[in-house]
């Protein structure tokens, strides 16, 4: 039964978002690990990026698109929004190609975790959730998780992309325990930021 709910919730995630949006403030200290370098020196760009994450986790792609584009208006040097926006652009379009080019250009001086994240764009576009999920994506997320096990976005997509439904459920439950109860592998527990806005989407995915 849980497997069925998991599959259905991947398609129909979206409830319980308002409380999450109230938490859409950037309180993350990137100096605590080798995370994907999403942060900007521009506070408005950070606010837009964090708001985009809330919509992304709740599969509100049109809204996520708006906020990621706004983040780039405030800080064109960011690479992270370009990765997501490439996947939201029509396949094979000039817009997709532009976002891929900009992501690779802007990540050149960033850390290894960030470069592996951008390398998701090198995977074939064979999934509606490309480049974050699809053939080959789990290997990339696994590499990122090895580089920085505390990263919660990394853990989320590591769990979502892992082969096998039982494995997906197990990893999502582990992530939920970390976020909601502060229980889990000490190397994986978050040490900075408020990730509570991720709890409801994970609960929805699990079908609880």
Kindly label every feature range from the protein language model.
Residues 16-18:
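Bacterial signal peptide processing site
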